[in-house]
Amino acid sequence: MAYTEASAEKIDALKEMGVHLWQMPNKNGHVALRPLLKKLAEAEISSILAEGGGEIHASLLEEHLAQKAYVYLAPKIFGGKNAGTPVGGAGVPLPADAFLLKPTGMQYFNEDLLLEFDVLEGGTACLQD
């Protein structure tokens, strides 16, 4: 488990449960991702699944740390102006600055659909530009 700050009591309790703990640098109130990924590589962990909210997804994209994207679609529509989005962060100002994906696969799981992509570097012009 990676953390930036915790009480000695909490650290001791987690260690007693057998949890491996890594104190990492703080970046904008969260664990700094690049040092964490370096630590994982040193532990011979070469692949992770970052299943989370829009902010972690945005951070991985903005820091060019994501190589693949797996997008699950369910036949349901959620909405509302305050609804969460799959990618948070500041976004990009122009379509040409968007993070590019290359489709690599598609699978159905009952009614749900999994789309698989490679994350490409940089942006290119699109029809709206």
Please describe what each predicted stretch is.
Residues M1-D129:
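Enzymes that bind and transform nitrogen-containing heteroaromatic metabolites
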